[in-house]
From Swiss-Prot:
Entry keywords, A to Z: Cytoplasmic vesicle, Endosome, Lipid-binding, Membrane, Phosphoprotein, Synapse
Gene this chain is encoded by: sky
Protein's UniProt name: GTPase-activating protein skywalker
Species lineage: Eukaryota, Metazoa, Ecdysozoa, Arthropoda, Hexapoda
Topology versus the membrane: Peripheral membrane protein
Main localization (coarse): membrane
Length: 587
């Protein structure tokens, strides 16, 4: 560690003493933390102690209060005690705080490692990256200051938690919180902490479904409109066409991806006791601070931020002009933000979203899909994996707990991703393979015989170049024969629930462009499905998204107005190696 020359001998001695004791600076961190990165954050720029500050409370004191049921006293201590970022107290404090929310019986010693062995077949940490569950947001797997080993540990924890808690279907914040926990404790302790947070019934800590996630950010938006009215009005004034939704969808990343680590750690001290309402309060303070800076700092002038306020907010958080203590003080000084008030808005927002599950566009009624709310049941996973040729799963099939599980994981990611895109009601049914070119031949006639009466159907294409893509088709293929009042067959049929997807090499879903209820769409944006004796096509309007010939051998893919998709394979033209079509039993 560099130090300054000059000064008196005692000053130099103090500095040298600091060098000798440098290792003590890191005693609060777990072994899988890159401490050299953290050194530059806070240690040598701490505010000088005036001697008037009360002594920081100890773990034992807090433990006694918690055992006595004095949660309010604990809350006040956590809010007011600014333990340094490297304080060893968190290694004991955080597990205790998270553990109080555990509703299940206390985990037996070794339970986590038994789960690891059941899922991976070994407790050794793999040197190769492992595929994360579908509920993880791959763009926000924030490691903070974890080493590569620490990141692998975080990956493993999240996988085991996903296996143990199959009800978790969408939880983008779970990975970052896992990473934060691992800075101060062991792998097993971090897992137990997460299990406590996820299993909490009294307070909400981590959203676990797409619906909860959406209700939460909309709740934050509603609260902000009241408690940070000046800020939200300012954003709309400088960007007249701006929808506030675009800003608040990323509200949690202002905190988890934007704030400096020392701020984040102090927020977690309170969050692990009080729940997600702490993050609500911090988000409101960030908005107010940003608004003030916009009016006084040229860096955040309207011209500089109006094109991307969301990104500007993240950048502002990285340079936030207040200390962790001041940030928390401001957050907990907001009046009228009780738990009851927040719950009232949350429930109202949730009911509103559920009531809008049926969208109306013109004369058509569509079921809006909360696509990530459900993943496959264990049996439906077995069924589709054992049947599928396109995903090349059958020859590697294995269940969790067998040695083959790791081999199937690369292919199972496709299954989980695809299943998460289906309308929620469809995921309740078991898939059945209706048609595959490998068993039923390459004939459009056979395709119709086996498929046309089923609704909906899922088409998956694997090309000779190994691209994998397809479509969810909401209507029966038999509708190609339905005639209008004039006795003419309709060229296109289907509904806006139809969507395209690509699984390899790109992974993406392309829903109907009108799914958000835009009433100004033209006819060319409502061309979902078409078929005759010579071809089938999905998606039209200035191009066909998927077109296949009568021999189901050759096809082409273009951009189209109905789905606003790019070509689903780079060349545009493709030769079909396998076509599979699935229906769903019991619909």
């Amino acid at each position: 560690m560099p130090y300054h020359r000059g000064g008196d001998a005692s000053s130099q001695a103090d500095k040298l003493s600091g060098i000798v004791e440098e290792s003590d600076l890191y005693e609060g961190f777990a072994p899988h933390v890159e401490t050299s990165e953290i050194k530059t954050l806070d240690f040598y720029n701490l505010p000088k102690q005036t001697g008037k500050e009360p002594a920081l409370r100890s773990y034992t004191e807090i433990q006694q209060l918690l055992q006595q049921g004095k949660k309010r006293d604990v809350k006040n201590i956590l809010r007011e005690n600014s333990w340094p970022i490297n304080s060893p107290i968190r290694a004991q404090l955080w597990p205790m705080l998270c553990g109080q929310h555990q509703t299940k019986q206390q985990m037996l010693d070794g339970f986590y490692w038994e789960m690891v062995h059941q899922v991976f077949g070994t407790t050794e940490l793999s040197e190769k990256p492992i595929m994360l569950p579908a509920f993880v947001d791959a763009t926000h797997c924030l490691p903070y200051h974890l080493t590569s080993t620490g990141r692998a540990v975080a990956d493993r924890i999240v996988n085991v938690l996903g296996y143990d808690c199959p009800d978790i279907t969408y939880s983008p914040v779970l990975y970052p919180i896992t990473s934060i926990l691992l800075h101060f404790m062991s792998e097993e302790e971090a897992y137990i902490c997460l299990a406590g947070l996820v299993g909490s019934k009294e307070k909400v800590f981590i959203n676990q479904t797409k619906l909860q996630h959406e209700v939460t950010w909309k709740t934050v938006m509603q609260i902000a409109k009241k408690h940070t009215k000046s800020a939200t009005s300012y954003f709309q004034r400088i960007c007249p066409g701006l929808k506030l939704e675009r800003i608040f969808m990323d509200w949690c990343w202002w905190i988890l991806a934007g704030l400096p680590f020392q701020h984040l750690v102090r927020i977690m001290d309170c969050y692990f006791h009080e729940g997600i309402k702490v993050l609500y309060r911090v988000a409101l303070v960030i908005l107010n601070l940003f608004h003030k800076e916009c009016q006084s700092n040229n860096e955040w002038s309207p011209d500089n931020i109006k094109n991307d306020i969301g990104n500007a907010l993240i950048k502002f958080c990285k340079k936030i002009p207040v200390s962790p203590a001041k940030l928390l003080h401001a957050a907990f000084s907001i009046r009228g933000l009780s738990t009851q008030y927040i719950s009232r808005i949350f429930i109202k927002t949730e009911m509103l979203l559920k009531s809008r599950s049926v969208l109306t566009s013109g004369s058509k009624q569509l079921i809006k899909s909360r696509s990530s709310d459900n993943l496959p049941t264990s049996q439906s996973q077995v069924n589709i994996q054992m049947m599928s040729h396109t995903l090349t799963i059958r020859e590697h099939f294995g269940l969790p707990g067998t040695k083959n599980f790791i081999k199937t994981w690369t292919d199972r990611q496709f299954l989980f991703t695809l299943w998460s895109w289906l309308p929620v009601r469809i995921t309740m049914y078991q898939p059945v393979l209706l048609y595959t070119t490998e068993e039923h031949g390459c004939s459009l006639t056979t395709f119709y015989v086996r498929v046309e009466q089923h609704e909906p159907t899922l088409l998956m294409i694997k090309t000779c170049n190994n691209e994998v893509f397809g479509a969810y088709c909401s209507s029966r293929w038999f509708e190609r024969n339905v005639k209008d009042d004039k006795g003419q067959r309709q060229a296109y049929f289907g509904t806006g629930e139809t969507f395209l997807f690509s699984l390899y090499p790109e992974r993406a879903k392309y829903p109907w462009v009108g799914i958000e209820g835009d009433k100004d769409l033209g006819h060319s944006s409502e061309l979902f499905m078409a078929a005759d004796s010579k071809m089938i096509t999905i998606g039209g309007g200035e191009g066909q998204a998927i077109w296949m010939d009568e021999n189901i051998r050759f096809g082409k893919t273009d951009s189209c107005k109905t789905f606003n998709n790019p070509p689903l394979c780079p060349s545009g033209d493709f030769e079909i190696r396998v076509l599979e079509v699935y229906g769903f039993v019991g619909i």
